[in-house]
Amino acid sequence: MALEKSLALLPLLVLVLLVLGWVQPSLGKESRAQKFQRQHMDSDGSPSSNPTYCNNMMRRRNMTQGRCKPVNTFVHEPLVDVQDVCFQEKVTCKNGQPNCYKSSSSMRITDCRLTNGSRYPNCAYRTSQKERHIIVACEGNPYVPVHFDASVEDST
């Protein structure tokens, strides 16, 4: 009798495990928009002349785990202003895709570049503050930045 009850519950258990197998990989997985924000947004941090800014931020934002990310840019503007870039001048991305947009005004950014000779796990970065137009790739609904493509000087 107990064996029959156990066998009757087996299909239900299999179904639950299948559903968990389907759902679980998406739980806790960072969306492309969330990854963009983690890797590129620092609205609260004003750009400073602190030479260790990049070393600290790259480590804090998990871009030195397993390898040293060679180049990264942080944007020091409100998130809504960066999201608005998705509705500004359309440009072609470096990889040839048509979903990049250039900001209509300059934005405060910090460029972080891995210094020569720096090797994992001792990632060391050169910090440089700039005011530049940013180019981001956008996608999704809502249409938001998912990739930082470049920064360019004002052409005027």
UniProtKB/Swiss-Prot annotation:
Gene3D superfamilies linked: Ribonuclease A-like domain (3.10.130.10)
GO biological process: one example: defense response to Gram-positive bacterium
Reaction catalyzed: an [RNA] containing cytidine + H2O = an [RNA]-3'-cytidine-3'-phosphate + a 5'-hydroxy-ribonucleotide-3'-[RNA]; an [RNA] containing uridine + H2O = an [RNA]-3'-uridine-3'-phosphate + a 5'-hydroxy-ribonucleotide-3'-[RNA]
Bias type Basic and acidic residues, positions: 33-43
Primary location class: secreted
GO cellular component, one term: extracellular region
Annotated spans, Disordered: 33-52
GO MF entries: lyase activity; nucleic acid binding; ribonuclease A activity
Residue sites binding substrate per the record: K35, R38, K69, P70, V71, N72, T73, K94, R113
Keyword Acyltransferase among record annotations: no
Disulfide bonds: C54-C112, C68-C123, C86-C138, C93-C100
Residues with glycosylation annotation: N62, N116
Subcellular location: Secreted
Active-site residue list: H40, H147
Signal peptide coordinates: 1-28
Key words of the record: Disulfide bond, Endonuclease, Glycoprotein, Hydrolase, Lyase, Nuclease, Secreted, Signal
A Pfam family this chain is assigned to: RnaseA
Enzyme Commission number, as recorded: 4.6.1.18
PANTHER family per the UniProt record, alphabetical: RIBONUCLEASE, RIBONUCLEASE PANCREATIC
Quaternary assembly: Monomer. Interacts with and forms tight 1:1 complexes with RNH1. Dimerization of two such complexes may occur. Interaction with RNH1 inhibits this protein.
Main function: Endonuclease that catalyzes the cleavage of RNA on the 3' side of pyrimidine nucleotides. Acts on single-stranded and double-stranded RNA.
Family that this chain belongs to: Belongs to the pancreatic ribonuclease family.
Protein name: Ribonuclease pancreatic
Classification lineage: Eukaryota, Metazoa, Chordata, Craniata, Vertebrata
